[in-house]
Amino acid sequence: MVPNLMVIKKHLIGLLLILCPLSLQAQPLFSVVDIQGIRENQLVGYGLVVGLSGTGDKSQTKFTSQSVKNMLSQFGVQLPANVNPKLKNVAAVAVNATLPALASKGQSLDITVSSIGDAKSLRGGTLLLTPLKGADGQIYAIAQGNLVVGGVVAQGNSGSGITINIPTAGLIPNGGIIEREVTSSFLTASTVVLNLKKPGFNTARNIEKEINELFGPDVALAQSHARIHVRAPHDPSQRVTFLAMLENLDIETGPRPARVVFNARTGTIVVGKNVKVHTAAVSHGNLTVSVMESFNVSQPNAFGRGNTAVTPETDVSIDQERGKVFIWPDSDEGTSLQTIVDAVNSLGATPNDLMAILIALDEAGALDGELVVL
């Protein structure tokens, strides 16, 4: 069956009653799913920023000069083929924007502009009219306007200078205008497809159950742990009302995965609440190798015929810290996250030490969780 407007009105009060007794772990439906056909699209273009105060691209940036010559030729200005103008006030830039879902012609977009060449700063510049294309090569928007640059660069004649933030990138608020709309099957398809942001069989089953309890049997059908098909009204106004009711529906999500995430570049470690550790003895010590090298000068006496020589002297020492041994207590459910944190702090371990300990625990089979290294 396909729900109509009368059914939606009939069950509106029932929806409010259903939402009240849900547990605190329930989340709004649209916070756990994406609607297929309602998505953002990325746009990109190539343009020129003019009006810079001598901080533009240098003469060795050939594509900037070529771009200016091509632009001038469109206005009837022809330069000799062997002439490469010096353009300190112009910079070649990449222009990008995000096209919102179901956006209409005439709406404005925020524009991001980034330098491509060797320009020092885009502060004070103006982006000339630039078409923005999608992945299919079609023009969906145009951009133009004055840049807002948060970075500052200052340099003296001696070559010394100072740079604050990033002066080679800027924004143009509402600097783009949508010229073409993206066609979507959302408004014409007989079903609405819900894609789970974090796939899970329990969550997919709960979504199917809650929607069918509200609108009737066979309205929602879970195709997999990541996709649910929902029959929706064909009339656009009824479909909007139908989705508004789905938006207010709370869903109990499945259990969160037990996961430890380690960023090797920054040393950041995030340990999920459901990570458990079983009985294990842990000892972690640091081994430090120091190599000190000094140079001695061998100077012969004044009447000798020897030569002055430089002799290196190397001193190698090894220092091994005594590592403490800690035994995590065990229980039927494993050691909690707080106990893990307290134990690591008592050992005085750094983030890298902690990651080494967790990897060793996982290899020993004492860690209930997934290790993810970024």
Swiss-Prot record:
UniProt GO BP: bacterial-type flagellum-dependent cell motility
Originating species: Photobacterium profundum (strain SS9)
Biological role stated in the UniProt entry: Assembles around the rod to form the L-ring and probably protects the motor/basal body from shearing forces during rotation.
Extent of the signal sequence: 1-26
HAMAP family: FlgI
Keywords: Bacterial flagellum, Periplasm, Signal
Cellular compartments per GO CC: bacterial-type flagellum basal body, distal rod, P ring; outer membrane-bounded periplasmic space
Family: Belongs to the FlgI family.
Self-association state and partner proteins as the record states: The basal body constitutes a major portion of the flagellar organelle and consists of four rings (L,P,S, and M) mounted on a central rod.
Name the UniProt record assigns to this protein: Flagellar P-ring protein 1
Locations listed in the record: Periplasm; Bacterial flagellum basal body
GO-annotated molecular function: structural molecule activity
Listed Pfam families: FlgI
Annotated S-S bridges: none
